[in-house]
Amino acid sequence: MKVKICGVTHPEDAEYAALLGADYIGVIFAEKSKRKTSLSMAKSIADTTKRLGAEPVGVFVEQTTDQIIAICEQTGIKTIQLHSTFPLGALENLLRDYSIIYAISVRENGDVCHPQSLPPKVIPLYDTEKGGTGKQFNWKAFSLPKDTFWMLAGGLNPKNIEEAVATLHPNGVDVATGVEFPNKTRKDPDLLKAFILSAKKSGEKI
């Protein structure tokens, strides 16, 4: 079970998550996000993440291909997360140099908003229509992806991660709000530990 801790805003949070076994540490560059980090902070988080054997992920929403590449070159990030507004035709150019996670929106009722046919190397991440809200979609009504590595996001937290994994059998899980202090962007060490350990343990059962 791969675990991604998203919206990390401080190297200390990245360090603790990586030491606990997180595989991916997400750094957000979306302009409208409360978790957006500066380039210097993102590089510090990325350096810390790589030093501890995890993979930093740059999360982009409205940037162009050239802007994404420029940010990645300045921060040393080699894995990027894109959203459904990013044109599929531009993925192949980025795949030459970067690993890609592609967020696909799911409505509350479990329906995929805009089903996408992605290149084989791209990892689909199924999330609620507005990611980072702490809300989940209807897991039982969701049509499970077949024969592909995929990740789950949307309203996950230490209390429901075991149920989520048992119900949907994802290959990876992604959390932001569910491991944060209330009304803050910093991660809560206790919630981080509970989530990561539970996700890893749950993954061993599927």
Swiss-Prot record:
Gene3D superfamilies: Aldolase class I (3.20.20.70). One of its GO terms (biological process) is L-tryptophan biosynthetic process. Its EC number is 5.3.1.24. It catalyses: N-(5-phospho-beta-D-ribosyl)anthranilate = 1-(2-carboxyphenylamino)-1-deoxy-D-ribulose 5-phosphate. It comes from the Bacteria. Keywords: Amino-acid biosynthesis, Aromatic amino acid biosynthesis, Isomerase, Tryptophan biosynthesis. The keyword Isomerase applies. Pathway: Amino-acid biosynthesis; L-tryptophan biosynthesis; L-tryptophan from chorismate: step 3/5. SUPFAM superfamilies: Ribulose-phoshate binding barrel. This is N-(5'-phosphoribosyl)anthranilate isomerase. It comes from Chlamydia caviae (strain ATCC VR-813 / DSM 19441 / 03DC25 / GPIC).
